[in-house]
Design a protein with these regions (language model features):
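Structural signature of nuclease core domains in nucleic-acid processing machines
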Residues: 1-130
Length: 130
């Protein structure tokens, strides 16, 4: 329970609550199916197939509409992060967030302006540049 309280005390958790209080939609556990270019999966493929599509499915943990209708994407993680391992942790999930961002922009027809990982292991929000 402490981890959950710490999340809602974080800046990101407060933003989620504020969005909800303003009446903006806060979405959780949104399943999605979309198609992406195969070149997004493997950049080494030849140009002959780079525009081919592959189907991608997943579940977006959370996103919300912030002020000015900006969409903020969140992905919650519980992984162990060794001391000094934060950059590796972020890099491990950067591609996943990229795919989620692309899917969410197709679904909502809005730009996703911020992407975050929230680590319950270290009780920290991490802004991820995509």
């Amino acid at each position: 329970m402490d981890k959950l309280i710490k999340y809602f005390e974080s800046n990101l958790g407060k933003r989620v609550l504020e969005a909800y209080k303003r009446g903006n939609k806060v979405f959780r556990e949104l399943p999605f199916y979309t198609e992406i270019n195969v070149s997004n999966v493997d950049e080494s493929l030849s140009n002959d197939v780079s525009e081919e599509k592959v189907r991608l499915q997943g579940v977006i943990d959370c996103f919300f509409q912030d002020v000015d209708d900006k969409i903020v994407l969140l992905d919650y993680k519980t992984d162990y992060i060794p001391k000094g391992g934060l950059n590796e942790f972020v890099d491990k999930y950067r591609v996943q967030l990229k795919y989620y961002k692309e899917a969410l922009e197709k679904i909502t027809e809005c730009d996703v302006t911020e992407c975050y990982l929230y680590s319950f292991y270290i009780n920290k929000e991490i802004l991820v540049e995509i």
